[in-house]
Each structure stands twice: as structure tokens, then as C-alpha cells.
């Protein structure tokens, strides 16, 4: 776009930024920094080797929002290590086109007795009774349903390139493809993590003690 004669260079830069904002919305830094300020978290700007992230203290746990590249794709993820005394695992994602096929091939899909939730989500766990107890919370189901794209799980450490977890420590994990810049969805994810950790403690599936690992 040509610079108008009456504009100085700063005016032109602001105009270009305004047009880009109209086309693509606010940038990741702007959204994540505002989110951190609202939820009393810490925004950490990225550099050459490490991307930006938001770190929130939730009781004895740290919930970390960042991005990761995998197979030339970018994913937004949230992670929260916690003490998992019984090794409870689950994985929840939205039902998609091929979900029915995988069920026909014998893939696990636990039903919790809530018709709409069972219709919309695929649930896997090493303890079906316990995951039903977790999802008996209406707030848990509401926070999960709020997310249009979700892969939510308890898993062990991130392998060779991630932090190594002590014995008995696992992490609550969320990811979706792309860079998530929707303020309300991001805020809802932090609420989801806080609610899940609280429910796991009530169930005896998490301890309210620091996990002894930093991401």
C-alpha cells in the first residue's frame, strides 16, 4: 500500500498494523499478554529457541500455555504436572468423521450416561468408573463443551525433548492445532485445568502437593 504524503513513517506503520489487525485479528503476543494480566499469570516473551508462554499458579500447580511444532504444524498446548498416586489416565476428544469406524474396529469409547455429552465426545480411560466420576461434575462437562477443538488427557512426561518427571508425576495435557488466540477460549482452558485438578484431588486421584518439576 502506498504511503500517503501527509503521513510520517510512524503513521504509515500504524496504518499497516491496523489493516493487518482487521484482516487477521490481534496477534498472539497481544492476546496472551492480556490474558496473563487478567488471570494474574506470568507472560514470558519468546526468543529464537523458545516460544512465548503464559504460566499461571493454580494452588500448588503450574499451568503452562505455549505452542509446539510437530510435523511442520503448530499446536497450542496447556500442561500441568501433578502427583498422580494411582496412575489414573484418560483421554477426551470431540467425536469426528472417523470415530464410528474406530469404534467398529474395537476402540474404547466410554459412555457416562449424559446423552448429549456421549454423542459429542469420545472418552478413553484405564479406569472407566473413575472417569465417569470425574465427568459427573456439570462444570467439567460445561468447560469441555465450551471448547470447539479439544484433545484433553492425563499422560506421562513429554519424552526425549520434554521435562523428565519424577516417579508418580504425570501431566494434565491439552492441545489443538494452530495458534489459539481467542481470549475467552483460552481463559476457559485455564478454568478447565483448575476445575479438573480440584476434582482429581477430591477423588483422591491427585495430591495437593507440588509435583517437583518445572516445564
Where are the regions that the model predicts?
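Charged, low-complexity intrinsically disordered regions
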Residues: 2-21, 28-215
Amino acid at each position: 500500500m502506498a504511503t500517503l504524503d501527509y503521513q510520517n513513517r510512524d503513521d504509515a506503520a500504524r496504518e499497516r498494523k491496523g489493516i493487518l489487525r482487521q484482516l487477521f485479528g490481534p496477534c498472539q503476543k497481544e492476546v496472551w499478554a492480556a490474558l496473563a494480566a487478567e488471570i494474574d499469570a506470568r507472560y514470558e516473551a519468546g526468543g529464537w529457541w523458545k516460544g512465548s508462554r503464559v504460566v499461571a499458579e493454580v494452588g500448588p500447580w503450574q499451568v503452562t500455555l505455549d505452542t509446539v511444532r510437530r510435523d511442520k504444524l503448530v499446536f497450542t498446548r496447556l500442561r500441568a504436572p501433578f502427583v498422580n498416586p494411582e496412575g489414573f489416565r484418560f483421554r477426551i476428544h470431540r467425536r469426528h468423521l472417523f470415530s464410528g469406524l474406530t469404534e467398529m474396529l474395537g476402540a474404547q469409547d466410554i459412555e457416562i450416561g449424559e446423552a448429549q455429552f456421549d454423542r459429542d465426545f469420545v472418552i478413553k480411560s484405564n479406569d472407566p468408573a473413575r472417569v465417569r466420576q470425574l465427568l459427573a461434575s456439570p462444570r467439567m462437562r460445561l468447560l469441555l463443551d465450551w471448547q470447539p477443538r479439544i484433545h484433553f488427557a492425563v499422560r506421562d512426561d513429554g519424552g526425549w525433548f520434554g521435562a523428565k518427571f519424577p516417579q508418580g508425576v504425570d501431566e494434565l495435557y491439552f492441545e489443538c492445532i494452530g495458534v489459539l488466540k481467542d481470549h475467552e477460549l483460552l481463559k476457559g482452558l485455564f478454568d478447565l485445568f483448575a476445575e479438573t485438578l480440584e476434582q482429581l484431588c477430591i477423588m483422591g486421584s491427585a495430591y495437593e502437593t507440588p509435583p517437583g518439576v518445572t516445564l
